[in-house]
Amino acid sequence: MHRSRTAPRFVVLSLKLCLLGASAQAGADDHDRGFYVRFEAGLADAGTLESLLTAVDHPTRCDVLLYPDPGLAPSSDAACRDNTSRPVFDNSFDLGSKFAGGVSIGYDLGKLRLELEHLSRHQGGQTVPARTASGNVVIAGKGNEWSPVDPPTERVSDFSSREFLVNAYWDFENDSSWTPFLGIGAGWARTNLRYQVRLLRKTLAQGYQDVAPPLTLADRPAAAAGSLSLFDHEFRGDVFGYQILAGLDHALGDRTSFTIKVRWARFAELTGRGIATVIRSHAPVQADGTTPFGSDLEFDGIGNVGVSAGLRYHF
């Protein structure tokens, strides 16, 4: 899930290019300079979002709240006393392509342009089968506990991102009315999403206690049959990122131009912690009956590939 932090290098490179470009443009004609505003709209494809849920998890038989007398729970078992936090679910989601719109204010130095940009986008959501993280023997051992009618799922929904970036563009001026340009930018995104994982156990009629060696009935307390475990939490935060841009400007007059632009943007991981909504149809607590059942989430792959069109007006 962790990726190298290349964004700071982009910031340094951006500043160097800006200073170099500004020096080169010191003698530019006055008519090439000035403030401008741009409005744009288009589509942004969010690509694949990766999630990782990490938590402390115990075998079902360890849950003291499943017994009429908590002393009947095998709390002395090594597995019941293991409070190591491990990856539980590791999944990916396709958030699809949705509308994106933005506004920018910039200053034109001739070939070099400096710009402040705000882009807003709302992506879709996706529900996928829950995927057990590799190496987690506890959650893997519960595979035969889940309902065959309503199997475990994970869902990401309500994804939104408000991005604030500083961009630098270089215009490749020529004799035509079309001006190609390249750009780089860096900034942050105020990101929001909802994540859910839902686990429903078999009922007794569906065979919850139909076990085969080495399992015994003690591994499947009857009170757990048909129970629901649900984690449903909203995550939000500011994540740093960078983008690469390219496009064409077409002059419509002395002050107005039409812009077509493509972008590739990537942002850092969004992380957070939440408490489960319900665990085995009782309070969201660990197997000891008191410790809150918390989970840590990481979301990687935040970014987009987008195309937009808009108008730029020079003051």
Language-model features: locations:
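Extracellular/periplasm-exposed beta-strand and loop segments of Gram-negative cell-envelope proteins
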Residues: 47-96, 119-163, 189-239, 268-306
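Residue-level signature of outer-membrane beta-barrel architecture
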Residues: 107-109, 170-172, 248-250, 264, ...
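Cleavable N-terminal export/targeting peptides
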Residues: 1-32
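Outer-membrane beta-barrel biogenesis signature
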Residues: 22-38, 48-57
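Outer-membrane beta-barrel channels and translocator barrels
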Residues: 32, 109-112, 173-177, 251-253
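Transmembrane beta-barrel strands of outer-membrane/channel proteins
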Residues: 39-43, 107, 116-120, 182-188, ...
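Outer-membrane beta-barrel "beta-signal"
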Residues: 36-38, 301-315
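Membrane-embedded beta-strand positions in outer-membrane beta-barrel channels/transporters
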Residues: 36, 100-104, 165-167, 243-245, ...
